[in-house]
């Protein structure tokens, strides 16, 4: 699974979050929220080990996710843009005064649904390319997390690799099933075509023997 963790926060106040595996990403994400420089809008990524924390902040609302480094940047930032729009559309002005985790019970289900989509559905990346969204992602520099955390604050990122492998296995099975379905339909079409050709050949032979296409001497 490409995306393993996500949160939505106002400043350092976490409003909703979800982790798809056993990890301490939440603790590290909260450290990042406290250390993000400046007050303006930003798109930034921080790497740690084989994982990258991607951050999008717009109008004081921060959306963050942790993904495998091989997920690249387009899919994670497309995910963040999607989550930002859904969150603002759902809660509006309530965002500015909500208490910590006020939206967690409801919106964590949305996070789970969209993480599943952006991690496993190949259409997610295709749609992002067609829309031409997130052009600014090209300019996002991936920094090491040590650049914003003091040496004494840095925590080792712990990820349950068993759960991660299960996600990869699920994706492989899904792709295999899709491939098998494609092959099955192709074989069905080929079989139908051969049957049609065979029927045409039989008809031509019968029509020739019966002296005409309406089979006058055989009817």
UniProtKB/Swiss-Prot annotation:
A biological process term (GO) from this entry: vesicle-mediated transport
Recorded topology in the membrane: Single-pass type IV membrane protein
Main location class: membrane
Topological region Vesicular: 211-219
GO cellular component: vacuolar membrane
Subcellular location per the Swiss-Prot or TrEMBL entry: Vacuole membrane; Prevacuolar compartment membrane
All copies of domain v-SNARE coiled-coil homology, residue ranges: 126-186
Domain Longin span(s) in chain numbering: 7-111
Pfam families per record: Longin, Synaptobrevin
InterPro entries assigned: Longin-like_dom_sf, Longin_dom, Synaptobrevin-like, Synaptobrevin-like_transport, V_SNARE_CC
Tissue-specific expression: Expressed in flowers, leaves, stems and roots.
KW RNA-binding (keyword) present: no
Transmembrane portions of the chain: 190-210
Keyword Coiled coil attached: yes
Stretches in topological domain Cytoplasmic: 1-189
Note on domains (UniProt): The longin domain is critical for the vacuolar localization.
Function text: Involved in the targeting and/or fusion of transport vesicles to their target membrane.
Full protein name: Vesicle-associated membrane protein 712
Species this chain originates from: Arabidopsis thaliana
Gene name of the record: VAMP712
């Amino acid at each position: 699974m490409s995306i393993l963790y996500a949160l939505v926060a106002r400043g350092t106040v976490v409003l909703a979050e979800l982790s798809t595996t056993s990890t301490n990403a939440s603790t590290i994400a909260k450290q990042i929220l406290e250390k993000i420089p400046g007050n303006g809008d930003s798109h930034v990524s921080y790497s740690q080990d084989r994982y990258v924390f991607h951050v999008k902040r717009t109008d004081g609302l921060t959306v963050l996710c942790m993904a495998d480094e091989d997920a690249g940047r387009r899919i994670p930032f497309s995910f963040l843009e999607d989550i930002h729009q859904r969150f603002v559309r759902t809660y509006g002005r309530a965002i500015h005064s909500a208490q910590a985790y006020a939206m967690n019970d409801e919106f964590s289900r949305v996070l789970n649904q969209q993480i599943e989509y952006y991690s496993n559905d190949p259409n997610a990346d295709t749609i992002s390319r067609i829309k031409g969204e997130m052009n600014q992602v090209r300019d996002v520099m991936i920094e090491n997390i040590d650049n914003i955390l003091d040496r004494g604050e840095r925590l080792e990122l712990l990820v349950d690799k068993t759960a991660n492998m299960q996600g990869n296995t699920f994706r492989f099975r899904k792709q295999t099933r899709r491939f098998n379905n494609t092959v099955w339909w192709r074989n069905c079409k080929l079989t139908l075509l051969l049957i049609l050709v065979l029927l045409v050949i039989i008809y031509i032979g019968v029509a020739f023997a019966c002296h005409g296409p309406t089979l006058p001497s055989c009817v």
